Amino acid sequence: MRAINLKTNHLTAPVGIDAGPLFLSWQCADGVRQTAYEIEVTANNKTVWQSGKVQSSAMHADTPAVADSRVRGAWKIRLWDENDVPGAWSEARFETGLAQCDWVGEWVDPETEPIDIPGDDAINAFARPNWERKQAEKEAAGKGAAESYKPHRPASYLRKSFTASKGEARLYITAKGLYAAWLDGKHIGDMVLAPGSFTGNKHLGAQTYDVTALLHEGENELLIALGDGWHRSTGGVDGDRDLFGDTLGVLFQLEVDGKPVCVSDDTMQATQCGPIRQNDMQQGEVYDARLEGELTGWHGVRTYRDDLPITGMNTVPILEHEAFPGKLLQTPNGETVLDFGQNIAGYVEITLIAHTGQKVKLTCGEALDENGNFTQENFQDRNRHKEGGTAQMLELVCKEGKNHFKPSFTIMGFRYAKVETDADLTDAVFTAYAVYSDMAVTGAFTCGNDAVNRLVKNSVWSQKGNFCDVPTDCPTRERAGWTGDMGVFIETGLTLMDCYPVAEKWLAECRLNQYPDGRMANIAPPNARPGYMTPMLCMSAGWGDAAILVPYAMYKRTGDRKILADNYEMMQRWYAFLLGRAQQTTDEQQGGDYAKFTVLNGMDYGEWCEPGITPMQAMMNPRKSVGTAYLAYSGRLLAEVADELGKADDAANYRDTAANAVKAYRAAFTENGVIHSDRQCEYVRAIAFALLGEEESKAAAETLNRMVAENDYHLNTGFLSTPFLCDVLAKYGYADTAYKLLLQPDAPGWLYEVGKGATTVWETWTGIDENGKPHESLNHYSYGAICGWLFGGVCGIRYTDGALTIAPTPDKSLDWAKATYDSPAGRVVSGWRYDGDVVTYEFEIPANLTADVTLPDGRKFTLAPGKHTV
């Protein structure tokens, strides 16, 4: 038996991680059962830790803090099989980055000279008049003096020459803004949008690049381009700029054999006269190809010290992935539009032959309107946005001859791009690139219904489109790391893609942005300046509970206690805040012994996005049962977390609180365990969160089933309860109803969007209405959570705490179904197929795992590793 798919801290051969303890994981091959393992860790070719032979079937291990900064390390492992025979050694490599104290350079600000910005480029021509109009309206309404427009700025370029000898060379680099770097004209690394998305006034992350092959003996030149990035671009629905400061900066050091040979300092030169004339994450990028080649306008820089914490590269990089060729079409109103066939987050590469000064402008959007014309109106909030909306523009000012432009410092959500140009497009090539964090697709589901298959593909694409360093709600309007979205999607997200590193990074941002009183920022990292209602809405149950739900799910899937330890204080503080809301309940609001465990005060989003209920109605009249339900549910989970961390007293306290919250829920929101409501969500949540007794849950499920049938098999659940709906129905014997909900072709239902040609999951059930008019975002991953039931219910795969159960729920409406899940333990397959009334099952179990299988006819058995037909 041998170990395969070795990972260090959930990463494959990571470079630049922080020093500290390591979480090592692997899978098994060429055997049946692992009975023991042995691990040896080396740092800079010296053995620093040996486990010895450990009698265990676990496929992960924790090490002590074996690696310092700047370490090139490795670990090797061998396994013993069921016959106590050792296998061959397998090896993996890792490398640590710099510690905070290792940085010797200074922060360099390149913008020390006045920048001439004509303002006639596409982005400023769009933003300036809108800004000035809105400011004039603000002043006229007596809401303050009009503020002057700040033009969008060109990228900066910085250079430094240095002499070096050949050797093992590493570049350590980070930026306030985004950077791209070249050594002697060769691009460094394949990460885009580096260093990534952070709460930039509280911390940043740095990358480590192996530049040994790029370094020359003798004279070398390092060139860096610096863009606005998340640091000071427009952001969110309000279009706020300079969120983390109005000054960009870069910090780096290039080392050869562990010694700095080139660091950021005041000997550098900078210019703003390069081809990137404007750049903004949300609004777009303007590129003047006439300025390519030798850069001019070099001037001095300003340096400064900053004690801003800098962490290593503890996640996966953002990369370019799939490429989509553009197909030119003419719309009814005569516009030239590119259709790339897939709604993505990314950008467009342009290649064409043109004359000097000719321009090509692309405006990117998700849909065509009801008349077949290009539109962006579905995702705009032009009234709120300070610059009149999200531009999503790319402009190329051409040089003579062949032109090539691929954006460096922007990303946008789109399927279509409107083309405006005075150049000949006969031989032009437009290619869209999907840009997202480097996550492998780990879940595949196919069945006999093409629309369901498309729904799964759409869900994967919405995850790709919104997991760009941190999870966001949409890649167009808000681009916000909403807690609520992640809370309802994490289980499904971990199945569809290997998103653990992205979720782990996002949780660090959540911790940094938690309020002193324990409430959770709804969005992390911040993407707008807080409004007056922001602190009130940051107390929302279900949203704040992501602080518990997300790390809990990650631990149950991987067994890594570090995710619990890192986030335990955040979990505790949020739960204490939620309990504090309950403690404010007055006798007038609720009587009885458990009134102080009933969450009735404060603002909540409530169920959110229920069909027939507007967002404003939901906010003004949230479902009061939600807070108490989460006080019970999250309390149980937090008790489990405390137990895992060895905090028995905490665990007992949280269990007591959760039990009291259940009693409070029953007293306030049921009549002796009977729910009286016309909304499906109240039944779903009560059953899913075990707020009722078993017989009461059966009765509630029966009522829920009847309500769904009376609603012509349409759901009317909202944001928080929809992920549980089909699972709850199937669990209590109403799988046929769950399937009818799944296959409902009309809105509200999952397949309505598929029928409208969607290639991603929508924000609302009617993102494109019956008249063909698009509304709201057309790339929101949260409703893709239904895929969790396809894997865990339809095909029955559930992997948690290192154990695998399979309990499929076949139905003739699909004819056949097959789910493949590349779990932390290896590939799991569960499938079934009807032949008349006979169902045949096929299963595949990875090495070192068994599966406890339960079939609908009551048969129960355990499967060993291998392929099985039943």
Q: For each predicted feature, which ranges?
A:
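Extracellular/oxidizing-compartment recognition motifs
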Residues: 1-476, 484-485, 499-504, 521-528, ...
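Alpha-helical support elements that line or immediately flank enzyme active sites
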Residues: 170, 347-366, 420, 484-514, ...
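Active-site acid/base region of carbohydrate-active enzymes
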Residues: 177-178, 260-267, 271-272, 416, ...
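Active/binding-pocket-proximal capping segment
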Residues: 179, 187-190, 194-195, 510, ...
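Alpha-helix capping and helix-loop boundary segments enriched in small/acidic/polar residues
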Residues: 146-153, 170, 196-200, 210-212, ...
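Non-catalytic C-terminal accessory modules of carbohydrate-active enzymes
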Residues: 246, 251, 268-291, 312-322, ...
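C-terminal capping/lid segments that line or modulate ligand- or cofactor-binding pockets
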Residues: 280, 284-288, 478, 496, ...
